[in-house]
Amino acid sequence: MNNNQLSAQLARQLGAHRHLLVAFSGGLDSSVLLHLLVGLRQQLPDLQLRAVHVHHGLSAFADQWVTHCRQQCVAWQLPLVVQHVQVDSQQGGIEAAARAARYSAFASTLAADETLLTAQHLDDQCETFLLALKRGSGPAGLSAMAAQTSLGNNHLLRPLLGHSRQQLEAYAQQHQLSWIEDDSNQDPRFDRNFLRLQVLPLLNQRWPHFAAATARSASLCAEQEQLLDELLAEQLHNLLDEDRALAIDGLLTCSAARRFALLRRWIALFGVTMPSREQLQRLWEEVALSREDAEPQLQLGQYQFRRFRRRLYLLPLMADLREISLSWSLDDSLMLPDGLGELVSGEGDICLRAPQSQQKVSIRFSAQGKHRILGRAHSRPIKKLWQELGIPPWQRERIPLIYYDDQLIAALGIFVSEAGQTPEGQQPWRLHWRKK
């Protein structure tokens, strides 16, 4: 394929995307992609380009790579953003952690109207397919990398997926491009390197079109997944409420295959790592089908599955706030923990009996014993009150509770206790919960 054909193909893949952020490591693949786009900019004057380089801090040469990328971007007259990240190798291994840190940096760099372009090629697609095969993945995992997908509210394009590394090398040599070589790419302890250095050369020697064949298989798997998406979309929509909680009863009569397919598509809505088949089985048996009076939960990375009133919820892990007690002088606003916002005194639509001069006001996140709230004739245990008011267990510990000394006055936004009622003829104390 000649240069004109490459440029024309790239322009077709871009479609209407004109504001582009290019992931630029300085290696062969991203150097070729960026060079192609710089050339395409001559033909498409409305094309706006930026590059982003992620400094992982894992190599002794990382600073030199930044220098190379800066020099290249100056020569090609386009802005470069350098993002420094910290890689936590405890989170799924060094490769997965570096990738997670990298894509987090991309997401934070993207402007609202920008599309991210990455330079994965045909050989990368083959490696991804084989790694998914090694993990025992189904059609979703074997679909490998999509040529176009979403990244948060932005789009991600991989325009080089149809081209081999050999083709990219030929292009780079023809245009006398310079690029860096990551020293870690020669370490076979990493799974991708092991495949690239030791496995794929043998496969390609025996079957020269092996990478292209695996790419076709990945594409067929992706088609099957798309078909399932279309066939199950209406049923999934009918099982969801406005909070994207999933109705358990609607899954009871499904076959196991259909149930797991629906669970996977529900989980995919949240953009989290897809659980294994074993984890899905545990989700169904230990959470969905647990006793009615239980409060089951199952952790998945930084997320958790919970159940409430015959519905499944997928939630981020939350800090335990039950032991926290915050004194409040009322002269200033009070910042709440764990991103819950702040409380502002003297304004707002929450009206309570004003504290007496000697009473100490505090904010807590747990309560014990029985309480009588406005609108109820009798005192009730706090757990029963939460249940009757329809508050899920994980929300109960994130609702600020107003105390005067050790007396519960109100659960903000939920109820006011009898002790918090403003006596007739007195001015109430107003406050506002400013949520983030």
Curated annotation (Swiss-Prot):
Similarity comment text for this entry: Belongs to the tRNA(Ile)-lysidine synthase family.
Entry keyword set: ATP-binding, Cytoplasm, Ligase, Nucleotide-binding, tRNA processing
Major location category of this protein: cytoplasm
GO biological process, one term: tRNA modification
This protein's name: tRNA(Ile)-lysidine synthase
Entry annotated with the keyword Transcription regulation: no
Residues the entry annotates as binding ATP: 25-30
Enzyme Commission number, as recorded: 6.3.4.19
UniProt free text on domains: The N-terminal region contains the highly conserved SGGXDS motif, predicted to be a P-loop motif involved in ATP binding.
Catalytic activity reported: cytidine(34) in tRNA(Ile2) + L-lysine + ATP = lysidine(34) in tRNA(Ile2) + AMP + diphosphate + H(+)
Record gene name: tilS
Subcellular location: Cytoplasm
GO MF annotation, one: ATP binding
Organism: Serratia proteamaculans (strain 568)
The protein's role, per its UniProt record: Ligates lysine onto the cytidine present at position 34 of the AUA codon-specific tRNA(Ile) that contains the anticodon CAU, in an ATP-dependent manner. Cytidine is converted to lysidine, thus changing the amino acid specificity of the tRNA from methionine to isoleucine.
Pfam families with a match to the protein in the record: ATP_bind_3, TilS, TilS_C
PANTHER family, sorted: TRNA(ILE)-LYSIDINE SYNTHASE-RELATED
